[in-house]
A protein has these predicted regions:
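Ribonuclease/tRNase effector modules and their secretory precursors
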Residues: 1-105
Length: 105
């Protein structure tokens, strides 16, 4: 299953950033734009978890929730130093097992 979830509320004043090259690669590989991924942060039922397996130099987090296009997305992100900016690392559609875990929480 997915890591234990952290309950967190995102707010409307969030700022987002990402590497433009990575955004293009992500869209080609996963067919999910970072612009769509941003909309998951406004899903009140989205769940956030620490991603300890991929957090060597900084704390990475996983967000799973529904986008404005009703896709269940798995979004990897970090908080920048100012803690108001969220940097998107990757975004993809959730797998069947992730969807099942999400629905059980």
């Amino acid at each position: 299953g997915l890591a234990k979830y952290i309950h967190s509320m995102y707010n409307r004043n969030m700022k987002f950033s990402w590497n433009p090259k990575k955004a293009v690669e992500n869209l080609k590989k996963h067919k999910v734009s970072f612009e769509e991924a941003v909309t998951v942060f406004y899903d009140p039922l989205a769940k956030t978890a620490l991603d300890p397996d991929h957090s060597k130099d900084e704390d990475r987090f996983i967000l799973i929730g529904h986008s404005s296009k009703s896709h269940l997305l798995f979004v990897v992100h970090v908080y920048r130093e100012d803690s108001e900016t969220i940097r998107i690392i990757s975004a993809r559609k959730a797998t069947k097992s992730e969807k099942k875990d999400f629905e059980e929480l």
